[in-house]
Amino acid sequence: MLPSELVKYKKKSQKIIALTAWDSISGSLAEHSGADIVLVGDSLAMVCLGYKSTLPVTLENMIYHTNAVSRGFSKEIEEQSLLVCDMPFLTYQCGENKAVEYAGKIIKNTYAKAVKVEGADPEVQNVISRLIRMGIPVMGHLGLTPQSYLNLGFKQQGNNSESHEKIKRDALSLEKLGCFSIVLEHIPELLAKEIQTELEIPTIGIGAGKFCDGQVRVTADLLGLNDKQPPFCRPIIDGKKIFGEKLKEWVAAEKLN
């Protein structure tokens, strides 16, 4: 799967599904599920590294985990899910040259075929434009941007007229810059619908309603492995309880042997 193929999905009204992964096991599960995109998100900071936010995760962490995820893939490379790696905090906010260097390290040192960048402030737009000119495909991310939680909090964005219009403008700008898709996180459903209608590139929602061209979920949230669940992700199983009880049963049984 190449990034450019996702536009064809939108034209055919074919739903796009993305799952996150952080190691070879979760990568294998995500790929075998039939997900079109496997995202190595900086959410791994909380999912598997124990941090309280995405901010502490480093470029080295992202490269390490992206390589681990790719080793879980079993299909030929042209048949694999599209592997996308998040650019972590302060790898693209510190100037275009550094951003190109860091994104280049991701693409050169992993099997990722694209990077994801949060936000659309003028400086970020300059970085995105430069990366795309250098041949690095970019997925945008608007709405609730976790790397900006110190300013914005973990709350829904776009729910007043000013932020509503800003997110729409930013989405159009990212498309014009050449992003191949945009993640819309935790915004009102009708705003997501407006953006989906106006853009030619696909929108991939998380907590943005049913009108996006696709959906992305943190796999650990779907499997019920986290103590705290986001309000927009209902687990498909209570994984922490199920697996925890089974492990307790095994440990207790082994102690009796």
Swiss-Prot record:
Q: Where does Mg(2+) bind?
A: D42, D86, E118
Kindly identify the residues recorded as the active site.
E185 (proton acceptor)
An example Gene Ontology CC term for this record: cytoplasm
- Tell me, what is one Gene Ontology molecular-function annotation carried by this entry? 3-methyl-2-oxobutanoate hydroxymethyltransferase activity
> Which residues does the annotation say bind 3-methyl-2-oxobutanoate?
D42, S43, D86, K116
Q: Which UniProt keywords apply?
A: Cytoplasm, Magnesium, Metal-binding, Pantothenate biosynthesis, Transferase
Give the first-level EC class, as a single word: transferase
Where is this protein localized, as stated in its record? Cytoplasm
- Pfam families, per database record: Pantoate_transf
Single Gene Ontology BP annotation = pantothenate biosynthetic process
Q: Which domain of life is it from?
A: Bacteria
| Entries under Gene3D superfamilies matching the protein | Phosphoenolpyruvate-binding domains
Cofactor, free-text remark: Binds 1 Mg(2+) ion per subunit.
Functional pathway: Cofactor biosynthesis; (R)-pantothenate biosynthesis; (R)-pantoate from 3-methyl-2-oxobutanoate: step 1/2
Q: Which cofactor does it need?
A: Mg(2+)
* E.C. number(s) listed in UniProt: 2.1.2.11
Catalysed reactions listed for this entry: 3-methyl-2-oxobutanoate + (6R)-5,10-methylene-5,6,7,8-tetrahydrofolate + H2O = 2-dehydropantoate + (6S)-5,6,7,8-tetrahydrofolate
Q: Does S-adenosyl-L-methionine count among this protein's keywords?
A: no
InterPro entries, alphabetized = Pantoate_hydroxy_MeTrfase, Pyrv/PenolPyrv_kinase-like_dom, Pyrv_kinase-like_dom_sf
- Which PANTHER family does the protein's record reference? 3-METHYL-2-OXOBUTANOATE HYDROXYMETHYLTRANSFERASE
User: How does it associate, per the subunit comment?
Assistant: Homodecamer; pentamer of dimers.
What is its biological role?
Catalyzes the reversible reaction in which hydroxymethyl group from 5,10-methylenetetrahydrofolate is transferred onto alpha-ketoisovalerate to form ketopantoate.
- Family listed: Belongs to the PanB family.
Q: Which NCBIfam families match?
A: panB (TIGR00222), PRK00311.1 (NF001452)
Protein name as it appears in the record:
3-methyl-2-oxobutanoate hydroxymethyltransferase
Identify the species of origin: Prochlorococcus marinus subsp. pastoris (strain CCMP1986 / NIES-2087 / MED4)
The gene it comes from is: panB
